[in-house]
Amino acid sequence: MGKSSNIVFDRIKEERQMLSFFKIFQRADLSSDCMRALPYSFISKVSEKDFSYKMVIRAQWGKTWDVEVSKNPTYYYIETRGWDLFVSDNALGQNEFITFTHRGNMVFHVNIYEQNGLEMRKPRKFQTMGPSSGIKKEEGENSLIDVKKEEESDESPGRAEFLVRKKKTEDSKSSKKKMTRNKVKKKSKSKSKQVLDGVPEFKITIRKSYLKFLAIPKHFVDDHIPNKSKIFTIRHPNGGSWKVLCLVREIRTIFSGGYSKLAREFPLMVGDKCTFKLIKPFEFVLLTSKKNREKMDQCMID
């Protein structure tokens, strides 16, 4: 007991003599420029000998993440690719308090403290999937309740709307259904024309908070999203794409890291009707309706 206490004390004493900084990982701000920035008061004290644009983040259980450091005219910051992997691997975003202690040569040891104040000493376990159901029964029942609530309130502005179409493969199709599919294909004027009718999709009306992060409907998550946080590609129908972190949580799943950049550059506006089509296992094409936007612009002109 006494020996263990001395080891902890010696570690704290040693780390107090090293340069360090902390960050609080909030769900809506996981990959913002501010979140990835290295504090000026910290970076100004790192010697030229110790500094490198190659940075290593090391957890207590030994896992490491290689990240790139870049510089703009104002500050140094961590590139999103390695940062988002660190965030997703540790399922961060629940107001964790994390210290970054510089051990030299841009190697940082991190200590992760959960919202309850306890230190995380081993990686979080992601929810396990059953061989047939694809998700634990209890979580599936909760998902149904959440979706029902969304469906009951979808008349209010900004509420998530949900639609999943399953591809029909039967040979004996009625001529009426074939005509309907042909009409849908003719209406498509972009790259989405290559997407067959029946691909999984969900619809969202953009509200203010959805310019920072986006909650994905539960039914869609259960049917089409893996049970572990992953990086997805979201494409513009006219070209261009963004890497976005799909952060999986027991309560809900969201697009977080990289999503706010997508919202700025696409661009998305409050009131836009958006359709996310899952064209590949980890790739969406995003379609938007500009009717509301055109009305808003017209009102401003008038």
From Swiss-Prot:
Basic and acidic residues composition bias: residue spans: 135-174
Gene Ontology MF terms in the entry: DNA binding
InterPro entries: B3_DNA-bd, DNA-bd_pseudobarrel_sf, REM_fam
Superkingdom assignment: Eukaryota
This protein's UniProt keywords: DNA-binding, Nucleus, Repeat, Transcription, Transcription regulation
Segments of skewed composition (Basic residues): 175-192
Major localisation: nucleus
Annotated region of DNA binding: 21-116, 199-292
SS bond partners: none
Natural source organism: Arabidopsis thaliana (Mouse-ear cress)
Compartments where located: Nucleus
GO CC annotations, alphabetized: nucleus
Record bears the keyword Nucleus: yes
Record's keyword annotation contains Transcription: yes
Name of the protein this chain belongs to: B3 domain-containing protein At3g17010
Record region (Disordered): 123-192
Entry-linked Pfam families: B3 (PF02362)
